[in-house]
């Protein structure tokens, strides 16, 4: 990771003007030190991908100074890497320190009166703006280690420097900067240091404030999958050690190998994720690399859970270790600075006054890789982190390493020595061993023959080729016993082979069952590769289902695997009407290897009698769901209501009367997304159809409509069929009556008559209306209106194609074209441009329908 160092100097101008302020002297020493580091301390983590090697570590410097009423800030981060100059005539570039001294000693045309008129608050606000501009020029997260060194002469008032402290807080929270305050007045800076999580020190040697060996800073994260909880331990760092060896796959002496892979950009994760505890005897030697790092906390005086976590890791012995994973993104091109963590987003976020400051996530382009570290105690309060090769890195490298070692160790020898070596490598027998082997072979063949005869007696109708089978059995038994004896020559002496008993006849096929599969290196490689693919699938699924996780919470890791069907394969199981073809069989879903362990001797009856504390410790099916204080049930109910509202208001089409069935009684208030589109408010006829089947819901609905939303909704839905026709806004007792009216044939031709319910207008005094009788305002519903419009469009389209009412095919063409056009219009969600869509659908299908009906008429 690249190192970015920001020095901040705040000091009042003294009466006796100093040539160089003390804070700038410290900054100058640090600048000189960083120049040395940019040449010597450029090492970083090894490559974790075949895409390329990480580039050398660069060092950057910036300065912000507030001296009296004069102020200076670097416009950009200065690269301290030694530049290669080709032309001697070029003038050296002025450094940030030189620019700062010039700006403070020779201010730009400001007199004393203008300086005195500037308040301290304005100066700190200007400094905060300049610091925000520097933070916006930092690279994407995971590539930079930021150190902020503050050199104040005395503690200013908090209300004056609050804006500048907020800019430093932005660097701390969203750019994981390490803050160090160097001041003689430690008590005055304790409050600000606690707010910034900074380390307040009194140091006359600023060179000790920057640790050049730090390669990564972040948190240690431990996740618990069962209850989807996680714990973070901040302020950890990985440091390089001086005795670090170069891994075997890196050859610094060969310059040709360095140019094989190009330099790429590595973006490291913000946390070390805990994987598992492991015994060192279980890790194959070729997975362990020679790269060793050091794990420690960044602040020596830090107390709390991070110090306790470090003590626990230091207690790991030489036989046990903890494996942690550091995610990394590898990209051939640099990612731009993250706009999600810019100063503008920071101001917007802090204006909402959050209780806890959360870091916004950033999506980085590139290949997803990971580093694996084996953490063990090192002593003196530190841990060593040994780099482990992942499955993708070790694939083929172990066998290649073994081959190279044997080739390097293979020295040419003369013919006599090679012949003696070959003879020595052959197995050596003596008379006792051969006799003992023949005795074991005889016992094995006797047992095999007995077992063979026993099976033949159980099968009376045996085949004719019994002698051939018996000969093959004896040959296989001899081959197996001799091979077994030769394999035991190196490990077991033949004197101990007398204790070996052969109980059943063995065959060569069973040899694979005797050896331990856990010893195969290929098995470990395949298992690691399979786990790596599972992790990639989980990450991909979590990115695609982000909105669902916000509604339903995080899913269990075992339930994330889904069995997907192709669209064509899925449609085979359903009819065109949407019904199942037959009884569908449940799909076999692969579960994890971890079986659910039920508490022994636990029944539902015993579980009901247990108190809450003991029941929470038990393991039973559905127990976590029942003991969550109804949070899961409330979440399911809330999501079902949301889903029903979306289905009810968003999925309803324009030419259908039937509503989708909903599981809950809905609020009469439509969702805000619906009000943004005219014509998407539900019509009165659909609400009528919904309420007709349930009288209780009708009473509740009418009460809600009259009480909660009296007239505003009906005024907005001008294109829909209202349940209540408002006659006036005057006061009076309303007596709604229900009437049944027959739908006239002129409204919809060819449609069957159906009864509708309307509510009459309320009675009003005689002064407001001359007549006191009830007026029925029967209106046409939206679906009826759309059907009538479509029939008119279809009729006009047929007339354009010379198919009039008197034509014999008119009725059939009219009905068929109406149904086809209605099918094309059913997916429309609004009424905008509906008439044009009707004309388009009818004209596109008119010729085909007319030709079909004419051919049908000719055949008849």
From Swiss-Prot:
Pfam families: MTBP_C, MTBP_mid, MTBP_N. Keywords: Cell cycle, Growth arrest, Ubl conjugation pathway. Residues 717-731 have a biased composition (Low complexity). Residues 732-758 have a biased composition (Polar residues). GO terms for biological process: protein localization to kinetochore; regulation of protein ubiquitination; traversing start control point of mitotic cell cycle. It comes from the Eukaryota. Residues 671-788 are annotated as: Disordered. Residues 772-788 have a biased composition (Basic and acidic residues). GO terms for cellular component: kinetochore. May play a role in mdm2-dependent p53/TP53 homeostasis in unstressed cells. Inhibits autoubiquitination of mdm2, thereby enhancing mdm2 stability. This promotes mdm2-mediated ubiquitination of p53/TP53 and its subsequent degradation. Belongs to the MTBP family. This is Mdm2-binding protein.
